[in-house]
Amino acid sequence: MRIITINVNGIRAAERKGFFSWLKKQNADVVCLQEIKAQEDQLDERFYPSDMHTYYHSAERKGYSGTGLYCKSKPDRITYSPWQDINSEGRIVQADFGDLSVISIYLPSGSSKEERQALKMEFITERFMPHLRQ
């Protein structure tokens, strides 16, 4: 299985720079996207590759964070952030394929303020790592 992860720093900007032409050449089974910075209503058919199942998890705030997954095979299950208190930032989307889980995650920046660094570390140690062990 070929899995690619990429921070697109804005899916619309990436599209203008040839992202989808590049993607077609990769022959990926799953593509994890971080920092899509778009709401689904801002995305037309160009952002839904015809040969893949598309799952976006947008932040409520326009132009901010967000994650996505493109999957060749339809996952058995999709989960959009199991933690409701951070769901509004669109930071996690998970695809389950039998015993395999693929997670696209965009962690909070730890460089902006001490409070955000503490949030990032708490998220990793208290939430995400236990989630991975399940």
Regions found by a protein language model. Name each.
Residues M1-F47, Y64:
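N-terminal, active-site-proximal structural segment of metallo-dependent hydrolase catalytic domains
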Residues F20-L23, S112, Q117:
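Alpha-helix termini
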